[in-house]
Amino acid sequence: MTKNIHDVAYELQKAIAENDDFKTLKESYAAVQADAASKNLFDEFRTMQLSLQQKMMQGQEITEEDNQQAQEVVVRIQQDAKITKLMETEQRLNVVIGDVNKIIMKPLEELYSAQQQA
């Protein structure tokens, strides 16, 4: 009997939620949200990040001023231990999710590789 792919996806969702890095990420995010200075800085960083992404998606040039502002925010972020921990944990979780994505996409990769070799 074939498993329903959506059921497997929900199992994966549950496994991610139970992952130690995800639990640490939730704790780190709560710590950032509980500290007004960290929260404000994190919100500023996210706003800047989204603005730069939007500019890139619209084909707009990222100016020297944009780069300078981003660098200044990054320097301040690196000085905030709570945000640094949050970002490091998020990066570890992103690696896990990237690995899972490679596994999920393997059948398509093999299909297209076989097509090119034929």
Curated annotation (Swiss-Prot):
Gene3D superfamilies membership: YheA/YmcA-like (1.20.1500.10)
InterPro entries: Com_YlbF, YheA/YmcA-like_dom_sf
Protein name (Swiss-Prot/TrEMBL): UPF0342 protein BALH_0781
Pfam families associated with the record: Com_YlbF (PF06133)
Family: Belongs to the UPF0342 family.
